[in-house]
């Protein structure tokens, strides 16, 4: 655009604007998973993800990267025999203290829990869940899930949405 600050757009003068990433960010992490078969019917699976991120600020200093989540993972104990399957599983998330939050998040008390000093932080949480499935036929599957059995109040990092309390889900699936 040859450095122009305005262009003609459909007969109207329009200001030229650009969103630019002018700083640097460094993100690194580690993800690991394991599967253990105790028997033909019983299996344990677990996954964990650890992410760290730093971004350069306008003054040249570094601070926590907004979208680098705290440690999170899940663990499943699955029993599956013929047409019946049970999955007892936990989902979990680590804590971010006020100092661990990105500067852009530190002023958002409405989005996070408040610590003893009155500062926002993202507390750790877990949910314990149980799902059962029965395959009546090749085409018909029934599922029942009880989620958040311990009725924990939790919020996925930076989502702003608190999870529902205990849930019961019943479903029938028929495939043509």
Where do the protein language model's features map onto the residues?
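Outer-membrane beta-barrel transmembrane domain signature of Gram-negative proteins
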Residues: 19, 118-121
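C-terminal beta-signal and adjacent terminal beta-strands/loops
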Residues: 1, 92-113, 121-125, 129-176
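Gram-negative outer-membrane beta-barrel transporters
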Residues: 9-102, 138, 150
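Surface-exposed loop/turn segments flanking beta-strands in extracellular/periplasmic regions
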Residues: 2-20, 107-114
